[in-house]
Amino acid sequence: MDKTLQVEHLEKYYGSRSSLTKAIDDLSFDVEPQEFVAIMGASGSGKTTLLNCISTVDRPTAGHIFVEGEDITKLKGEALNRFRREQFGFIFQDFNLLDTLTAYENIALALSIQNVKAAEIDKRVIKAAKDLDIVNVLRKYPYEMSGGQKQRVASARAIVTEPKLILADEPTGALDSKSSRLLLEKFLYMNQELQATILMVTHDSFSASYASRVVFIKDGKLFHEIHRGDSSKKEFFGQIIDVLTLLGGDVSDAL
C-alpha cells in the first residue's frame, strides 16, 4: 500500500535572487494511511509554508510531494484543481464557512461541486453531522453558531468527501479550552473510527498530544519527531514539552 503522503527533499525559497529566503530546507517525511500527525515549530519555522505546499496553495522550489504515489508537484490547471477538491479536506483556524449558507449547505457544497446526486449528498451530510454531533445546528447559519460548532461544521465539510488526507491549520486557534477539547476528541474519532488520515499544523502542545506522531521543524528543516506509542496523552504531552525546550523559543506559547 502506498503511503498517504511522501514529502521528498522539499525546498521553498521566497524573494529575489539577490535576497533569497529559504523557508523550507531539504525537508523529507512520510505519513502512513490512517495516521494522525501534528507539525510543530516556532513562528517562522516553515510549518505553514509546508502545509501550503502540500495543499498545492503554493508550489515548492524543489523536491516532490506524493499523495498515494501521485506526484502532485507535476499537476497543473484543472487536473490540479480536481485533485485538490477530491483528495484533500481542509480545516482552517477561521472556519472559512460561507455566511449566506446554513451548516447543511456549507457541508453539502463540497459534494455539489463534485456533482454528487442529491439523495447521496443528503445521506452523507446527515452521517457526517451525526459523527460530529452537529445535527442540531444543520439549519443554522454561521452567525447563529458558537466557535466550536462552526469548527465541527468545517470538520464535517472536510470529511464528507472522504478525502485521502485532511489538512488542518491551527484548528483550535480560535476556540476556548472546552471547545478545543471537544474538537480534538472529534479529530480522534475521525482518525480512529472513520479511518481519516490527518496532518495538523499547531503551535499548541495540548492539541499536538492528541496526535499519534509529532514532527518538529526548525528553520525549515526536520528537527525531531516523536511517536506516542503506548504513552498516555499526559505522558506524550510531557515529551512534546521536552522537545520544545530543546527546540528553543518560548515554551509558554505552546501551552
Model-flagged regions — what are they?
Residues 101-109:
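Short coil-to-helix segment of the ABC ATPase nucleotide-binding domain corresponding to the Q-loop/switch region
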Residues 141-145, 149-151:
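Conserved ABC ATPase signature
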Residues 63-71:
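Conserved ABC transporter NBD signature motif
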Residues 166-169:
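Catalytic Walker B motif of ABC-type/P-loop ATPase nucleotide-binding domains
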Residues 55:
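Helix-to-loop junction immediately C-terminal to a conserved catalytic motif
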Residues 160-164:
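A short, proline-enriched helix->beta-strand linker immediately N-terminal to the Walker B motif
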Residues 155, 183:
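Hydrophobic anchor residue at the start of the ABC signature
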